[in-house]
C-alpha cells in the first residue's frame, strides 16, 4: 500500500525527518511547541538551553534541515524560519524484564517520528506579488471566506464612530 504524502512547495521549503526516536511523542511535543514559528538562530539558542532530554534529537534535526537548505537549495541559514514542526507517535518497542521465580514484566518503550519544515523567509511572497498575480486585484481570502464576520466588524466600527461624535454621551448631569 502506498502512502500519500503532502506535496510541499519545493521552491521555498526544506524538510528533515527523524524516525524511531526512543521517546514518547507528548514529551517531544513539549519542546516542538516552543520552537514552531521561530527563526533558525533563535531556535538553536532555545534548544541548547532547554533542560529536556527531547531537545538534543530535535537540535540535531534542526541542524540537519538547515544543512539540507544550504546544500541542496542554496538558502542562507540566517533567513530560515521553522514553518512546520510536528511529532507523530511511532512504534512501541516491547521487551520483557526477567523477574524472580521465572516471572517477567513487560516493558514498553514508545518511539516517535519528528518532522521539521524550514521556510526561507527572504523568498516568501509579498502582498505586491499577490496583487500582480491577480491582475491588480488584491483578494483577502479570510474576508472572502467569512463575509458575515467582516460585516459584523464594520458594524462595530461604525457604532464606535457614532459614539465618538457625541463625547458626553455617558456623562451624568
From Swiss-Prot:
One cellular-component annotation, GO:
large ribosomal subunit
**Gene3D superfamilies, per database record:** Ribosomal protein L22/L17 (3.90.470.10)
Gene Ontology MF, one: rRNA binding
Q: Which UniProt keywords apply?
A: Chloroplast, Plastid, Ribonucleoprotein, Ribosomal protein, RNA-binding, rRNA-binding
Q: Does the keyword rRNA-binding apply?
A: yes
Q: Which InterPro entries match?
A: Ribosomal_uL22, Ribosomal_uL22_bac/chlpt-type, Ribosomal_uL22_bac/org-type, Ribosomal_uL22_sf
What compartments host this protein? Plastid, Chloroplast
Q: Name one GO biological process term.
A: translation
Fetch the Pfam families from UniProt.
Ribosomal_L22
The principal location of this protein is plastid
Q: How does it assemble?
A: Part of the 50S ribosomal subunit.
**Role this protein plays:** This protein binds specifically to 23S rRNA.
The similarity comment for this entry is: Belongs to the universal ribosomal protein uL22 family.
* Entry protein name: Large ribosomal subunit protein uL22c
Tell me what organism the protein belongs to. Answer: Drimys granadensis
Amino acid at each position: 500500500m502506498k502512502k500519500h504524502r503532502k506535496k510541499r512547495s519545493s521552491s521555498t521549503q526544506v524538510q528533515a525527518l527523524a524516525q524511531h526516536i526512543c521517546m514518547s511523542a507528548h514529551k517531544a511535543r513539549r519542546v516542538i511547541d516552543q520552537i514552531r514559528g521561530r527563526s533558525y538562530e533563535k531556535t538553536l539558542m532555545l534548544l541548547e538551553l532547554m533542560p529536556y532530554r527531547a531537545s538534543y534529537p530535535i537540535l540535531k534535526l534542526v541542524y540537519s534541515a538547515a544543512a539540507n537548505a544550504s546544500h541542496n537549495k542554496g538558502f542562507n541559514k540566517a533567513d530560515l524560519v521553522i514553518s512546520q514542526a510536528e511529532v507523530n507517535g511511532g512504534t512501541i518497542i516491547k521487551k520483557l524484564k526477567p523477574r524472580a521465580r521465572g516471572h517477567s514484566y513487560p516493558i514498553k518503550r514508545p518511539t516517535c517520528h519528528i518532522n521539521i519544515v524550514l521556510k526561507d523567509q527572504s523568498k516568501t511572497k509579498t502582498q505586491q506579488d499577490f496583487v500582480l498575480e491577480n491582475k491588480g486585484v488584491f483578494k483577502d481570502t479570510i474576508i472572502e471566506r467569512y463575509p458575515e464576520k467582516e460585516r459584523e466588524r464594520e458594524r462595530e466600527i461604525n457604532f464606535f464612530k457614532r459614539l465618538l461624535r457625541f463625547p458626553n454621551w455617558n456623562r451624568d448631569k
